[in-house]
């Protein structure tokens, strides 16, 4: 399974961490691309260091949570397979997805490889999952999310549930990550599902 994980400048890097780890454990062929703002978010939210070089943060992030085969793609490296519809990509996940990136994708514009890959998935009618993390939402945000959904994307907002009685922040992260993985057909259980009493190992 070929998957691209795009990381933009919205808060929510821990979700990307859990998704990358699960995909790697599942044996997926994963490529990671982070925008400049996304790299800064990783440095702050994963490593707690605002001054950390974004490139170093991304490399450490992939080394810590990916597999040895996980590849980092530069923000504007359009030689990546995800940049063309002729190279079949099973899923593109943009997590976290900023509202600026949502607007760019909806407009059919391309400021980086993440936007290009998302556009390719839409035109080829393949799986695109975006995980927005913003509040409150303006009418522009809501309209853009609706347009993106109508274009074929799965919109999985970073809204964790509480019916599984989470005990830690990681439990909340796992709920959202699990819904993303469900959306692309990866059969792992990161959280207790409704009606189930036990959680299987990821």
What positions do the PLM features span?
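A cross-family phosphate/adenosyl-ligand binding-site feature
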Residues: 1-128, 136-202
């Amino acid at each position: 399974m070929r998957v691209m994980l795009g990381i933009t400048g919205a808060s929510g890097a821990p979700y990307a961490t859990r998704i990358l780890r699960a995909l790697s454990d599942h044996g997926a062929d994963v490529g990671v691309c982070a925008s400049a703002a996304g790299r800064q978010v990783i440095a702050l939210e994963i490593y707690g260091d605002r001054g950390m070089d974004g490139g170093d943060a991304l490399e450490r992030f992939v080394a810590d949570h990916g597999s040895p085969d996980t590849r980092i793609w530069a923000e504007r490296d359009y030689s990546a397979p995800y940049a063309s519809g002729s190279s079949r990509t099973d899923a593109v996940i943009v997590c976290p997805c900023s509202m600026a990136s949502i607007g760019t994708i909806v407009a059919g514009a391309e400021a980086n490889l993440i936007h290009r890959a998302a556009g390719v998935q839409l035109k080829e009618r393949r799986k695109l999952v975006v995980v927005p993390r913003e509040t409150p939402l303006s009418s522009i945000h809501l309209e853009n999310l609706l347009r993106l959904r109508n274009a074929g994307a799965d919109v999985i907002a970073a809204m964790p549930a509480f019916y599984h009685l989470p005990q830690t922040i990681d439990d909340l992260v796992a709920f959202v990550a699990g819904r993303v993985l469900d959306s692309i057909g990866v059969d792992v259980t990161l959280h207790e599902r409704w009606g189930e009493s036990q959680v299987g190992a990821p």
